């Protein structure tokens, strides 16, 4: 499969076809991975995200798993529920947007130093479009860290995510990033399956130093 045209039309459909705004209207003040997996996400962010950087937490929630002792210049949040984002103490500001309808991010080109998508990539119906926008707003050479587990809301996760085994989700996300123009793509297993913690995987992609390579 060289591009998304090789996938059936239903690959990015969902069982629940009602507007996403209805599903996310009521805030869920819960975490979707356990404390060990959360700690692994935090350690990854500590390693990868620059001090005093502008961080974009895409598809965020009432908590961001950024390390509390690291100074960032700004943390921009995005999500679908205003109450949850307003409750997140890590966010400097946030915006509401349904990326499945409009993947265009309301941010300046080359204005972000690093981006995170935590346990949410499975809900994107236009993953390559969203990631292309991330490549636009990220500075040359900067990165996005995408983390995911084996959990999801099954009525809202896209069909291809649910059809692909857990062991192949990394390959799928790497493919998304490749199609969106990212380079130096790296897959990591942060919490191996079969242990007492929730499994957790990460895929990291970097924007080429030449923005034209993302076009």
Predicted features along the sequence, with ranges:
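Class I SAM-dependent methyltransferase SAM/SAH-binding core
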Residues: 35-36, 40-106
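Short alpha-helix
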Residues: 40, 163-187
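A short SAM/SAH-binding and catalytic strip from SAM-dependent methyltransferases
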Residues: 113-128
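Class I SAM-dependent methyltransferase Rossmann-like catalytic core
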Residues: 1-51
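A short glycine-rich, Lys/Arg-flanked "PGG" loop and its adjoining helix->strand segment in the class I
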Residues: 128-143
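Core SAM-dependent methyltransferase catalytic element
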Residues: 180-183, 190-215
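Conserved class I S-adenosyl-L-methionine
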Residues: 143-174
């Amino acid at each position: 499969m060289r591009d998304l045209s090789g996938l059936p039309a239903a690959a990015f459909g969902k069982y629940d076809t009602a507007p996403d705004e209805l599903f996310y209207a009521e805030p869920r003040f819960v975490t979707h991975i356990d404390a060990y997996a959360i700690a692994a996400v935090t350690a990854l962010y500590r390693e990868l995200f620059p001090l005093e950087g502008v961080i974009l937490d895409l598809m965020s929630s009432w908590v961001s798993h950024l390390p509390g002792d690291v100074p960032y210049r700004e943390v921009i949040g995005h999500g679908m529920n205003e109450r949850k984002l307003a409750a997140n103490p890590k966010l400097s500001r946030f915006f509401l947007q349904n990326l499945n309808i409009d993947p265009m991010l309301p941010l300046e080109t080359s204005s972000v130093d690093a981006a995170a998508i935590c346990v949410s990539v499975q809900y994107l119906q236009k993953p390559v479009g969203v990631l292309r926008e991330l490549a636009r707003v990220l500075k040359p050479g900067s990165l996005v860290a995408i983390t995911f587990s084996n959990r999801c809301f099954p009525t809202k996760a896209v069909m291809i995510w649910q059809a692909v085994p857990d062991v192949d989700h990394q390959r799928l996300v790497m493919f998304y990033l490749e199609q969106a123009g990212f380079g130096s793509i790296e897959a990591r297993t942060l919490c191996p399956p079969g242990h007492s913690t929730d499994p957790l995987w990460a895929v990291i992609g970097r924007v080429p130093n030449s923005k034209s390579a993302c076009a």
